[in-house]
Amino acid sequence: AVATIYISASVNTASATLGASAGLQLSGGTDGDAPTAAQLVTGLDLFETTYGAGAVAIPGSYSTTVWDGLLAHAVDKNRIALLAFDPTNTVDDSVTDAEDWIGTQTNTEYAGFYYPSITMTGSAETSLTISPEGYVAAKRSIAQNSVGAWQAYAGLNSKAGFVTGISTPIDKADSDVLDAGYINAIRVIQGSVRIYGARSASTDITNFRYITAREVLNYIVTEAEKRLEDLVFSTIDGRRTVFGRVEARLIGLLEPLRREGGLYEAFDSEGNQVDAGYSVLVTDALNPVTQLATGTVKAKVGVRVSSVADRIEIEIVKSNLTASVV
């Protein structure tokens, strides 16, 4: 047989070496420039109130302009702002950046910080380093859809499936430093990447140490609005019929949260329930006749949101053979 096609290869020498792989921002074209931080923030306006509660992020952008915009949007729309740091930041850099920014803000319980960046496998088995907000948002979605707004998206609940590692090694000491600086660490635990914190960026640790407190309130606010929408333009009669209907719908919203563990019930020393972890008031005191004459009906809801067990302490006492076990 005679080959009809031959491929010949030869080795040549050259003085130039292959160029290193690097990111390049194109310029001089007609498709515009890279968006500015202000333009990215403006884009948040497309996420209208009708989308309900949720989380927002601008991965890859770490300026205070972006953080300001995300927080303002979250407060206005009852959402959570997921914030991260430049991949080159150290633990101390990130704590400084977070604390400096938090000191200039209010309502920071609507935001959560996450560090460090994460790694995952790209095309051709390459390793990519990316901002962690997408990973956090995915685990948040799973936790809330499978359990509820009170479920922390941390620990085993955040075990990664496709994330292969983290850009900066984080040990327990680092995690504690980050936690004290209002930042949730991302760590490798038992061979898997996990979010190892459930705190908000709030300095009001009595009420909003945990991001789940704000998550539950966001859920209640948005769901209450939906459930009461059908009662708008109801007749206000002397029997206060609309009062009862408003109260029933709010209880119908809150009771499942209590039953499933999202609200913390109070019991006395004998195990008798003191309260259900929530209260609903639609009373004459809240609704004087002069107010009803203007068409406004007011209700008052109180809730006690369940907490998060982010630390388990065990005391182990060793006894000798002649002593009783403590």
Task: Label each region the model flagged.
Residues A1-P35, T42, T119, S123, ...:
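Small/polar, repeat-rich beta-turn/loop motifs that tile beta-strand-dominated architectures
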Residues T42-V326:
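Structured, hydrophobic secondary-structure cores that serve as assembly/anchoring elements
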